[in-house]
Amino acid sequence: MGNITADNTSMNCDIDHTIHQTLAPVVYVMVLVVGFPANCLSLYYGYLQIKARNELGVYLCNLTVADLFYICSLPFWLQYVLQHDHWSHDDLSCQVCGILLYENIYISVGFLCCISIDRYLAVAHPFRFHQFRTLKAAMGVSALIWVKELLTSIYFLMHEEVVEDADRHRVCFEHYPLEPRQRGINYYRFLVGFLFPICLLLASYRGILRAVRRSHGTQKSRKDQIQRLVLSTVVIFLACFLPYHVLLLVRSLWESSCDFAKGIFNAYHFSLLLTSFNCVADPVLYCFVSETTHRDLARLRGACLAFLTCARTGRAREAYPLGAPEASGKSEDPEVLTRLHPAFQTPHPPGMGGSPAGGLS
């Protein structure tokens, strides 16, 4: 608890941080333990997709890199909450960790939106828009997303984000009640960083489901499987990001007193913790549902066991290499969403007979 001060002016906000300081370490440790290895494997899977000239791998690698940047900032935030919300490092490190914390949300939303649009074009328009489904196009879009968020982060570097409370604790990225300068950037975050991308994402997945329902060559069990995956993706996306952005908007519209700040503090910080779980959900949804990933992970495990056996016995032993997609053309492996087990298959144009194609090209 403490009176938050900013620019040497007391805000007189006595806010109880107990619930936040209890929940945050649990969430941060969980995301560190599960999210770091999961995202490292996700990065490997994205590399295989890029090696196979699949544009999906570009988005997946960028999404994973953003998650790993955020995960790397978690030890600092863990230390912060364990020290009762006291930032023991310099001001610049607070700004950098704050940028990694908050901008990761919008970088993730951007790349999740790109993945959904790419899958929509692959399923609903498999014979059109090839110019948008190339490595060059994916790298260009990815660069725009990073530049957009880097420019936004300059705003935070221009303002002081470390302030002292009445207990002489240096709090980082916490201003209660909300400062007037923060409202504009919060409206931008809500409208441009969240609302617009999620409308695109929902429209894309709706188009995917419509295209699959119209596909006569896809079995009902596979259609049901696709529907479950799409719905799971949307539900997890909304669960991770919607509560935070609703409360961010509420704070920006109505938080002008300490009483309001104290009333919304726990709910707001709980919603912020929910966004952390996206770092764990991303690799699970977009990589580990693939049969190919299961096979590669099994081979990786076999190679590791073989290596350990060699080291223990001192005898040379052959280890099977990891499987990788073909180096030329599109991957023959199941693609995320569109080749799930291999549930998503390219619809044939009207009048074209035979069973559906084995995958997207």
From Swiss-Prot:
Region entry Extracellular loop 2 (ECL2), spans: 161-176
Residues with glycosylation annotation: 3, 8
Cysteines engaged in disulfide bonds, as pairs: 13-258, 94-172
Record topological domains on the Extracellular side: 1-12, 85-89, 161-176, 255-260
Topology within the bilayer: Multi-pass membrane protein
Record field: transmembrane: 13-49, 54-84, 90-125, 134-160, 177-214, 219-254, 261-289
This protein's UniProt keywords: Cell membrane, Disulfide bond, G-protein coupled receptor, Glycoprotein, Membrane, Receptor, Transducer, Transmembrane, Transmembrane helix, Tumor suppressor
Lineage: superkingdom: Eukaryota
Summary of activators and inhibitors of this protein: Activated by a network of residues that connects an extracellular-facing cavity to Glu-149, a conserved charged residue buried in the transmembrane core of the receptor. Protonation likely drives conformational changes in extracellular loop 2 (ECL2), which stabilizes movement of transmembrane 3 (TM3) and a series of rearrangements that connect the extracellular-facing cavity to Glu-149, a residue only conserved in proton-sensing G-protein coupled receptors.
Residues the record marks as site: Required for activation: 149
InterPro entries per record: GPCR_Rhodpsn, GPCR_Rhodpsn_7TM, OGR1_rcpt
Sequence ranges of Gly residues compositional bias: 351-361
Family: Belongs to the G-protein coupled receptor 1 family.
Function: Proton-sensing G-protein coupled receptor activated by extracellular pH, which is required to monitor pH changes and generate adaptive reactions. The receptor is almost silent at pH 7.8 but fully activated at pH 6.8. Ligand binding causes a conformation change that triggers signaling via guanine nucleotide-binding proteins (G proteins) and modulates the activity of downstream effectors, such as phospholipase C. GPR68 is mainly coupled to G(q) G proteins and mediates production of diacylglycerol (DAG) and inositol 1,4,5-trisphosphate (IP3).
Protein name (database record): G-protein coupled receptor 68
Source organism (scientific name): Bos taurus (Bovine)
